[in-house]
Design a protein with these regions (language model features):
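Intrinsically disordered, low-complexity Pro/Gly/Ser/Thr-rich segments with frequent PxxP/GP/PP motifs
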Residues: 95-131, 135
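Generic structural detector for well-ordered beta-strands
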Residues: 50, 55, 72, 105-112, ...
Length: 165
């Protein structure tokens, strides 16, 4: 957990001349957590969904191939509900700084209480591209992580590799 120091100042509620008190300021430094109250993609629901570990059809993605990701989502709550299943990606070895988790796909599903459903996503090399130094799309071979999760702060990372041509 990251912590940042924040300066907190207080001022009198009235001007010094109108309340008859000397003008003053109090300053204190406080430690506060540096995290969002709700992570990106977080949604509210009246039931609970369990995510299985994502299964890849291959550990490596060929330059002109596609990678299929499947995971089982189960409504383990007592009510019917809807869930937005999200696929996030991270490039571990890019030559430029890349997001820690980048949303690539999402799918909304409806499940009855106790019901399960397999959700499938497909990725291609074009989904791994970013703007290079010459401002043109580039995909660099290397290691990637992906997550299938209900928000950007959840899920279990599954590695795969983009092979060179």
């Amino acid at each position: 957990m990251r912590v940042r120091i924040v300066r907190v100042s207080s001022q009198p509620s009235c001007a010094a001349s109108s309340c008859g008190k000397p003008r003053f300021f109090q300053t204190r430094w406080r430690e506060v957590t540096h995290a969002a109250l709700y992570p990106f993609g977080h949604g509210l629901t009246y039931t609970r969904f369990d995510y299985g570990v994502p299964q890849l059809d291959a550990a490596q993605l060929g330059w002109d191939d596609t990678l299929t990701i499947r995971t089982r989502i189960t409504n383990s709550g007592a009510r019917d509900g809807e869930e937005v299943v999200q696929l996030y990606l991270r490039d571990r070895t890019a030559s430029r700084v890349r997001p820690v988790r980048e949303l690539k796909r999402f799918r909304k599903i409806a499940l009855a209480a106790g019901e399960s459903q397999d959700v499938e996503f497909t990725l291609a090399r074009a989904d791994l591209e970013f703007h290079g130094v010459d401002n043109r799309p580039v995909a660099e071979p290397g290691l990637f992580d992906l997550w299938v999760a209900p928000s950007s702060a959840a899920g279990e990372a599954v590695p795969f590799e983009l092979r060179a041509r």
